[in-house]
Curated annotation (Swiss-Prot):
It comes from Drosophila yakuba. Gene3D superfamilies: 1.25.40.180. One of its GO terms (molecular function) is mRNA binding. PANTHER family: CAP BINDING PROTEIN, NUCLEAR CAP-BINDING PROTEIN SUBUNIT 1. Belongs to the NCBP1 family. SUPFAM superfamilies: ARM repeat. Its main location: nucleus. InterPro entries: ARM-type_fold, CBP80, MIF4G-like_typ-1, MIF4G-like_typ-2, MIF4G-like_typ-3. Residues 31-243 form the MIF4G domain. Component of the cap-binding complex (CBC), which binds cotranscriptionally to the 5'-cap of pre-mRNAs and is involved in various processes such as pre-mRNA splicing and RNA-mediated gene silencing (RNAi). The CBC complex is involved in miRNA-mediated RNA interference via its interaction with Ars2 and is required for primary microRNAs (miRNAs) processing. Also involved in innate immunity via the short interfering RNAs (siRNAs) processing machinery by restricting the viral RNA production. This is Nuclear cap-binding protein subunit 1. Component of the nuclear cap-binding complex (CBC), a heterodimer composed of Cbp80 and Cbp20 that interacts with m7GpppG-capped RNA. GO terms for biological process: 7-methylguanosine mRNA capping; mRNA export from nucleus; negative regulation of viral genome replication; nuclear-transcribed mRNA catabolic process, nonsense-mediated decay; primary miRNA processing; regulatory ncRNA-mediated post-transcriptional gene silencing; RNA splicing; siRNA processing. GO terms for cellular component: nuclear cap binding complex; nucleus; postsynaptic cytosol; presynaptic cytosol.
């Protein structure tokens, strides 16, 4: 009997555990169903948004008792992550508040907490979407207009803070302005004087703020035909136009209007006092930008009109399209489909809006959010999905860009080249080149022929030389790239007169017979250090002829492909290192790569990248070589700046990696010390597994890491000093010579060069910013020509 009773008890225990698991499983299913219903509310279905909301409110109201916290979390997440459905979710919250006042208060508290947390963690978009949601809850009678105005006033108070960056003040003003389209009408009707007072404070701030950064962020230097407006100025003009229209806009869907009779009966909540967190030096704020304009209503002849540049609808449409790209940019097909499914597509010329927004992203200064190819691939998918209209709009946009290229920012010029060449490669390189042949009459340094030349160079990377030659009209012959073959001087007719020819031929035989690096060194040691016509140090610290013979011979033998060249460099890595002991020797290596491969830009780029990775040449040597007299003829070509930027990026990544490793080591050391002190005080073993002795870095290791980081920072600073000093020297020389000769200094060469200086500042702004005070003290001093100094001052103003 006793065994039977024990058996029964075990069965009861098993049943209890099984029932508990079933309940947990059932609860999880209900939670998943609730989440799915909330996420999909308002999306296209057989029923209207209003009936969707009514049904969902009934479901949620029944489940509030059990799943209150889950529902709160899902709704607050939707507010931040799905801002395009803001008014749908505020209506949902409003209806729930009308039925359950306590839940409404809990949601407001939860949303306020989300807002404050976003500000504290510098999640600026999340904070702005949270603020917008809170504001729209005023329309749904959940939050009182008075308490919202108090919050908006508190945020505008930040604009009066002293000794904080302007970008901080700008963001708080932008957050308030971008919220007003949702709630402006309600505030106008209920609290007009308070709203006007708020707008007056904003206007005072906007009138006194500095816009030194504006010119650095422009896509074009000219304002014709479309003004290049700074983002806050543009939004302020749009808000003023909205105010003139009595805050009536035509874009935002407002499902709560249908439920006004229910919502107006609900009790409202007051927002608590919210104080923005004070500024800290480690806070990073969004940088300013210039609003991109490519089209106006005259460019869209058929169908609905494009909203004016200062209509609030233009801002709302563009923001929505930007958010779609942000959400779906990882998957180009989904992104294109979502863009074409824009909910208000019948009210606007959608294809024009999409193309303008994508180019706005591509040309965004200082850098685009995503890789250039991301935007190119999305445009290709759009052309596939909408073949009847989108290719024509894109061709129209390309024509506009080409006609305005004379005043285009240099960084945007590069991106335009990269996009157009990529786009052509996906459409059989078909283009109506004859329409652009007027550019052939212009000087070779003019942006139009330069654009076509650079596009063909990029197309060559994506195709082959014969294909490029066949696709172009014969009139473009002078712009077609040279055949990309090595120029190996030791095989030329004049080779017999060159001092290294005999050894070069010996080296060819030895390498083909798979000789070792040591055997190569033995062959090279017979080369005399004198009698070489190339540049060489007077003290003979390196043998230029040795480098010449070795580099040109080895790379010529590996010229069949990138892989062959890489294999050759890797095999004879030790020989390269032995020959490249000084910076001058490294520059000599670069000189020989250029001499061999001057007709193959891509080969030069990848070879120099490989030499940097293998630490055969230093970053500073590459920078010095780029600004050498030898490269004067190449100075305005894109590939040279591609090399400089990959060099700087290589250095930046090295510094960031060392910084990260040091921080990680310090954290481990601190945690290990903390664990050991805890173990002395606490005999309990119920704590997290401590860091083992093997994981703990020693203080000596941390010190060595600090020394490595310090050395890397010194090298990084030196690299930037070399680059900026060389820019200053050549630009100052040009300006002085022009002044002396009485010539206009504003030549094509000057515009390219000053544009490249600006590009270095903007592309690497995060790293250069660390050394801005050093640069100001040593290089960009007050006695420098204002044209050069302005570029530096505009850069500093970006974070001021």
């Amino acid at each position: 009997m006793s065994r039977r009773r024990a058996h029964d008890t075990e069965d009861e225990g098993y049943d209890h555990r099984r029932n508990k698991r079933r309940r947990v499983s059932e609860n999880q299913e209900i939670e998943d169903r609730l989440e799915s219903l909330i996420l999909r509310v308002g999306e296209r279905s057989t029923s209207s948004v209003e009936s969707n909301l009514e049904g969902l409110v009934s479901v949620l109201e029944a489940d509030l008792g059990t799943f209150r916290l889950k529902i709160l979390r899902i709704l607050s997440d939707c507010a931040v992550r799905m801002p395009e459905k803001c008014t749908v979710y505020t209506t949902l919250v409003g209806l729930l508040n009308a039925k359950n006042y306590k839940f409404g208060g809990e949601f407001v508290d939860h949303m306020v907490k989300t807002f404050k947390e976003s500000l504290k963690l510098c999640r600026w978009d999340a904070a702005r979407y949270s603020l917008r949601f809170l504001a729209d809850l005023v329309n749904c009678h959940v939050i009182s207009a008075t308490s919202l105005l108090q919050l908006l006033d508190t945020m505008i108070d930040v604009s009066n803070e002293d000794t904080v960056p302007q970008v901080r003040r700008d963001w708080f003003v932008f957050a308030v302005l971008s919220t007003l389209p949702w709630v402006g009408r309600d505030l106008y009707e209920k609290k007009e004087s308070a709203l006007e007072s708020l707008l007056l404070r904003i206007e005072v701030y906007l009138n006194k703020r500095s816009k030194k950064h504006h010119n650095a962020l422009r896509v074009w230097s000219s304002d014709a035909p479309h003004p290049q407006e700074e983002y806050l100025d543009c939004l302020w003009a749009q808000i003023r136009k909205l105010r003139q229209d009595n805050w009536a806009e035509k874009h935002i869907p407002r499902p709560y209007l249908v439920f006004d009779s229910i919502l107006c009966e609900a009790l409202q909540h007051n927002l608590p006092a919210i104080v923005p967190p004070p500024h800290h030096d480690n806070f990073e704020y969004p940088m300013p930008w210039v609003v991109y304009r490519m089209f106006d209503y005259t460019d869209c002849p058929d169908g609905p009109n494009l909203p004016g540049a200062h209509s609030i609808e233009r801002f709302l449409i563009e923001e929505h399209l930007h958010h779609i790209i942000e959400t779906y940019h990882h998957e180009r097909k989904d992104c294109a489909a979502q863009l074409l499914s824009f909910p208000f597509k019948h009210k606007i010329p959608l294809e024009y809006c999409i193309v303008e927004v994508i180019f706005a992203e591509l040309f965004h200064m200082p850098t685009p959010r995503y890789l250039d190819i991301c935007y190119g691939s999305i445009l290709i998918e759009l052309c596939k999905l909408q073949p009847a209209t989108l290719p024509q709009v894109l061709a129209q946009a390309t024509e506009i860009l080409f006609m305005r290229i004379d005043s285009m920012n240099t960084s945007c010029f590069d991106r335009f080249v990269n996009w157009f060449s990529y786009h052509l490669s996906n459409f059989k390189f078909t283009w109506s080149w004859d329409e652009w042949d007027s550019c052939l009459l212009l000087d070779g340094e003019h942006p139009r022929p330069k654009f076509i030349q650079e596009v063909l160079q990029k197309c060559l990377r994506l195709s082959y030389h014969q294909r490029i030659t066949e696709m172009m009209p014969t009139t473009y012959a002078k712009l077609i790239p040279l055949t990309p073959v090595p120029n190996y001087k030791y095989a030329n007719e004049e080779a017999a007169n060159l001092p290294g020819t005999t050894v070069a031929h010996q080296l060819v035989v030895a390498i083909r017979q798979k000789c070792t690096p040591e055997e190569v060194v033995n062959i090279l040691k017979d080369i005399p250090s004198s009698g070489y016509s190339g540049e060489e140090m007077s003290d003979g610290s390196f043998n230029a002829l040795k480098i010449d013979v070795f580099v040109q011979t080895l790379l010529n033998l590996g010229s069949k492909s990138f892989s062959h060249s890489f294999a050759a460099i890797s095999k004879f890595h030790s020989v390269f290192r032995a020959l490249a002991e000084t910076e001058e020797a490294q520059i000599c290596i670069l000189h020989n790569i250029y001499e061999l491969w001057s007709s193959h830009q891509q080969m030069m780029v990848v070879l120099i990248d490989k030499l940097l990775k293998l630490q055969i040449v230093d970053c500073s040597a590459v920078a010095t070589w780029i600004f050498s007299k030898e490269m004067t003829g190449e100075f305005t070509k894109m590939y040279l700046w591609e090399i400089l930027h990959l060099t700087i990026k290589k250095m930046n990544k090295h510094v960031i990696k060392l910084n990260s490793e040091l921080s990680e080591a310090k954290d481990k050391l601190a945690k290990a010390d903390s664990s050991s002190s805890d173990s002395e005080d606490d005999s309990s073993h119920k704590r997290k597994k401590p860091i083992t002795h093997a994981d703990k870095p020693s203080e000596e290791v941390v010190e060595r890491m600090e020394e490595k980081l310090e050395a890397a920072n010194v090298n990084q600073k030196r690299l930037f000093l070399i680059v900026f000093q060389r820019f200053i020297m050549i630009l100052s020389e040009h300006l002085l010579r022009s002044d002396t000769d009485g010539r206009d200094p504003d030549t094509d060469w000057y515009r390219w060069t000053i544009g490249r200086l600006q590009q270095v500042f903007l592309m690497h702004h995060e790293q250069v910013q660390k050394y801005s005070s050093t640069l100001e003290t040593l290089l960009f001093t007050s006695d420098l020509d204002t044209h050069i100094l302005e570029v530096f001052q505009q850069f500093v103003a970006l974070r001021a």
